[in-house]
């Protein structure tokens, strides 16, 4: 069975939550036994859970996004309150203010960015500078967001979709004011468009970013270095790195170059930092780096 969302208790690693095939499970004994959790109302809905996030200091408080809405639990997942209905994607918590949450909603052919300042009890949409597909064939339905303790006011967004005659990377966006407003960082002078050396597509198979399309609906990842707020790691088919806040990007090693020290298997789904270790989950397993991604090592799992 595929697992689409997982969270580990920050204070007790024996407590783990995960979603599989629309059901939510919890273990209290390090995975020896599992129980399906959620009240009757929650379990009655066919959830496609996209993210589960735990409050950084209150382990009984959880946030969950799914195709059915944005939910909050205050009792370790036994009961869930729907905060917003609709289809939601990723959740992030401000690194210096646990009352401030961010999440992404999908509406028709676009995404919307929502911000909470009261611990996820209510949200407001923030539209200034956010991707806005307007053409008859344009769409922008997937976003990964990332934050960093190095600068808690920053939020990066990796938006994918199609516009202006090209598809794949729709744009890299940056907020410097906790999501109130956004600026377009990359690539080229407009969202999407035909790929070229000056308008690269990081969702495709090409190391130079000159091929159109890719798997921008399937493998999308983003993380910010915990020490350097200008350094980003992005995942699509390949692993990409930016050292200037998302303006320019390089691919250290193509998916088909396993001999290169920076090689990561194709189809990246998640990128995370644990302290200063970089971890990447992909269709080839898990890769880890202790030098900021210069050298990637495959983990034996």
Regions found by a protein language model. Give the residues of each.
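Extracellular glycan-interacting surfaces
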Residues: 1-301
């Amino acid at each position: 069975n595929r697992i689409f969302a997982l969270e580990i208790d920050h204070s007790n690693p024996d407590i783990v939550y995960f979603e599989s095939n629309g059901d939510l499970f919890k273990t209290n004994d390090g995975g020896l036994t599992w129980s399906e959790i959620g009240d009757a109302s929650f379990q009655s809905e066919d959830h496609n859970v996209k993210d589960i996030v735990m409050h950084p200091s209150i382990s009984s408080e959880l946030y969950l996004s799914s195709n059915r809405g944005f939910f909050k639990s205050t009792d370790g997942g036994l009961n869930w309150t729907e905060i917003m209905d609709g289809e939601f994607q990723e959740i992030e918590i401000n690194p210096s203010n646990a009352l401030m949450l961010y999440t992404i909603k999908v509406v028709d052919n676009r995404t919307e960015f929502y911000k909470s300042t009261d611990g996820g009890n209510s949200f407001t949409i923030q539209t200034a500078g956010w991707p806005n597909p307007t053409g008859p064939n344009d769409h922008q339905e997937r976003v990964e967001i990332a934050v960093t303790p190095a600068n808690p006011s920053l939020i990066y967004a990796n938006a994918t979709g199609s516009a202006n005659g090209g598809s794949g990377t729709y744009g890299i966006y940056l907020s410097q004011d906790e999501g109130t407003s956004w600026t377009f960082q990359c690539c080229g002078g407009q969202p999407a468009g035909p790929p070229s050396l000056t308008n690269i597509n990081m969702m495709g198979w090409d190391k130079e970013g000159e091929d159109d399309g890719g798997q921008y609906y399937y493998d999308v990842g983003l993380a910010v270095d915990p020490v350097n707020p200008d350094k980003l790691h992005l995942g699509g088919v390949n692993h990409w790195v930016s050292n200037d806040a998302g303006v320019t990007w390089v691919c250290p090693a193509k998916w088909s170059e396993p001999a290169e020290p920076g090689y990561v298997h194709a189809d990246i789904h998640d990128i995370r930092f644990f302290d200063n270790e970089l971890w990447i989950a992909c269709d080839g397993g898990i890769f880890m780096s202790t030098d900021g991604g210069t050298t990637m090592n495959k983990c034996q799992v």
